[in-house]
Swiss-Prot record:
Similarity comment text for this entry: Belongs to the NnrD/CARKD family.
Domain (YjeF C-terminal): residue spans on this chain: 11-335
Compartment(s) where it occurs, according to its Swiss-Prot or TrEMBL record: Cytoplasm
Name of the protein: ATP-dependent (S)-NAD(P)H-hydrate dehydratase
Keywords: ATP-binding, Cytoplasm, Lyase, NAD, NADP, Nucleotide-binding, Phosphoprotein
């Protein structure tokens, strides 16, 4: 059981079981995976960038961003390393555009993606939220929910407000949906499921079990709740920073999504044998996808916390999101080689 392992043991296990090796035989997208961040609107362009940039710096082979039309050029200007698709529209968009055609473009891209992040910089425009609902439905119906979803920010707002979305998430395979609420969003989720627990941990487990998902509650310690049992909860108390910057949660979604893409390469696609990672056949594998996903979330939390610690050490109160986000690559290398 993962909850019985120490921090060092969990990180070592993630390195051995979740992260595929880089081998000459692998083609582009096979080892590092393909991740898509869905978010970004006229008012919020930084959040999807920080999530996508963290994913890319983690080693993702191909990182896409699907955003609202007005956010596209801005996000593209930040870096040439991301593929940015301005396919979403807000309700007040005056462009003459065929939304069915835009939906086809989105679905065509999703068919090639291994992990989807929903929410960074999304906003709460009704047409944007409807597009997200359509995406959640499409992945469930076309791909049987096998493409993991990492849902944050206004994606969580949609979950709390739309009962049909909640029902769809319940139909995804266990552990294929990861929710990453902060303390306020966690309370909203508690209210949305209409259940009460005797303790904070029990409430986290109730949310995870009710929605058939993994819940990563961000806080002084990050708590990762399993859809299986309260006993399976993981707690990450590694040192971070005393300053919280906007965008730290976006860095976390990027780190988690890339770890999930790595885990899919190992668990779903089985791209290499144990011997290719230098492992013994006597090594016990993780039991199932939920174990891989829980461990991926733990690793993502560790990376984000260490980036935050280093950023704060270097800049103190002046630390900005870029000061931690740009450290993702070096921290990943330090932890996992």
């Amino acid at each position: 059981m993962l909850a019985e392992l120490s921090h060092r043991e969990l990180i070592k296990l993630a390195q051995k079981r979740c992260i595929p090796p880089l081998l000459p035989k692998f083609h582009k997208g096979q080892s590092g995976g393909r991740v898509c961040i869905i978010g970004g609107c006229e008012d919020y362009t930084g959040a999807p960038y920080f999530s996508a940039n963290a994913t890319a710096l983690m080693g993702c082979d191909l990182t896409h961003v699907i955003c609202e039309y007005n956010a596209g050029t801005v996000i593209k200007s930040y870096t040439p390393n991301l593929m940015v698709h301005p396919y979403l529209r807000m309700s007040n968009t005056k462009l003459d555009v065929d939304m069915d055609e835009q939906r086809k473009k989105i679905n065509s891209l999703l068919d090639r993606i291994h992990v989807v992040v929903i929410g960074p910089g999304l906003g709460r425009d009704p047409l944007m939220l409807k597009s997200i609902k359509d995406i959640i439905r499409y992945i469930l119906e076309k791909h049987e929910g096998k493409i993991p979803l990492v849902i944050d920010a206004d994606g969580l707002f949609l979950v709390t407000q739309d009962s049909e979305v909640k029902e769809m998430l319940k139909s995804y395979p266990k552990g294929r949906v990861i929710l990453t609420p902060n303390v306020v969003e966690f309370k909203r989720l508690c209210d949305a499921i209409g259940k009460k627990g005797d303790s904070h941990s029990e409430m986290g487990s109730l949310i995870a079990q009710e929605l058939n998902c993994i819940v990563v509650e961000k806080g002084q310690s990050d708590k990762i709740f399993s859809p299986d049992s309260e006993k399976d909860m993981l707690t990450n108390s590694e040192e971070g920073s005393n300053k919280r910057v906007g965008g730290q949660g976006d860095t976390l979604t990027g780190a988690i999504s890339c770890m999930l893409a790595f885990s899919r390469a190992m668990y779903d696609f089985k791209i290499c044998e144990q011997e290719e990672k230098g492992e013994s056949s006597n090594d016990k594998p993780l039991k199932n996808w939920v174990d891989y996903a829980m461990l991926s979330c733990y690793a993502g939390c560790t990376i984000t916390r260490e980036c935050s610690r280093l950023g704060f050490k270097a800049k103190g109160r002046a630390m900005q999101t870029t000061d931690l986000n740009d450290r993702v690559g070096e921290v990943f290398a330090k932890l996992f080689g």
